[in-house]
C-alpha cells in the first residue's frame, strides 16, 4: 500500500505542475468581491482562483490548495448562462473539498483501495478465470464511487454554510445544480451507485434539508 501511496503523491505533484502550466489567474470584479468575503470569513490570505484551459465545465482543487475553474465554465459565465454568484458557489464547493481534507484523503484511500483491489483481483482470477479481474475492478470502482459521492455531499454542505455566512445564501448553489445537466450535456441516470457524483436532484434535496435543519435548530 505504501508503494501505491508514494506513487499517488508523485502523480499528484506532477498533475499540479501540469495544471499550473495550462492555467492562469482568474480576475473578475464580481467574483473578486465574493472571494474577499470568503477570505474574511475563513481568515485566509490571498485566495486565488485559476482558469484551466479546458473546454469542459468543471471545477477542481489540487492537494497543494490551487482552485481551478475550467475555461468552459468561464465561457458560460461570460455568455450570461451562469451568474457570478453561481460561479462563486463552485469556488465555495472546492474550498469545502480543501478544508475538509478530501484531496489528501483521496490519495491515501484510493491508493489503499487500488492495492486491495489488486489482491482481490488476483485471487478471483484464480478462482474465476477471465471474469475474476473484472469483478475485482468493478468492486474497486463501487468503493471509490461511494466515497467520492460522500465527499461531494460534504463539500456541498460546507459551501452552503459558507454561502449563508457570507450573506449569499444557497439559492445560487441550487440554481446552478438545476442547470448543470443542461450545461454539461450529461444527464444523470436513475442508478448513481457507480457514479463519482450524486445526481443534481440528490444534491439539491440534501442542501434544502440541511438548510431547513439549520433554521429549525435556530428556532
Tell me what each language-model feature is.
Residues 1-198, 202, 211-218:
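A Zn2+-metalloprotease active-site environment signal
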Residues 205:
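Cysteine-cluster motifs in flexible loop/terminal segments that predominantly coordinate metals
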Amino acid at each position: 500500500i505504501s508503494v501505491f501511496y508514494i506513487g499517488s503523491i508523485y502523480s499528484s505533484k506532477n498533475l499540479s505542475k501540469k495544471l499550473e502550466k495550462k492555467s492562469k489567474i482568474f480576475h473578475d470584479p464580481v467574483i473578486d468581491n465574493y472571494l474577499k468575503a470568503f477570505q474574511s470569513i475563513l481568515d485566509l490570505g490571498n485566495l486565488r482562483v485559476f482558469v484551466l484551459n479546458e473546454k469542459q465545465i468543471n471545477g477542481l482543487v489540487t492537494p497543494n490548495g490551487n482552485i481551478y475553474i475550467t475555461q468552459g465554465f468561464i465561457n458560460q459565465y461570460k455568455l450570461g448562462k451562469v451568474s457570478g454568484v453561481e460561479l462563486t458557489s463552485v469556488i465555495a464547493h472546492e474550498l469545502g473539498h480543501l478544508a475538509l481534507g478530501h484531496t489528501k484523503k483521496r490519495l491515501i484511500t484510493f491508493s489503499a483501495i487500488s492495492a486491495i483491489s489488486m489482491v482481490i483481483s488476483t485471487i478471483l482470477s484464480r478462482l474465476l478465470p477471465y471474469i475474476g479481474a473484472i469483478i475485482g475492478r468493478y468492486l474497486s470502482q463501487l468503493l471509490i464511487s461511494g466515497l467520492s459521492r460522500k465527499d461531494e455531499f460534504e463539500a456541498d454542505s460546507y459551501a452552503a454554510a459558507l454561502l449563508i455566512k457570507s450573506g449569499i445564501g444557497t439559492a445560487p448553489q441550487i440554481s446552478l445544480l438545476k442547470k448543470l445537466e443542461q450545461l454539461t450535456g450529461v444527464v444523470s441516470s436513475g442508478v448513481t451507485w457507480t457514479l463519482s457524483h450524486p445526481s443534481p436532484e440528490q444534491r439539491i434535496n440534501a442542501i434544502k434539508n440541511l438548510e431547513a435543519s439549520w433554521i429549525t435548530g435556530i428556532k
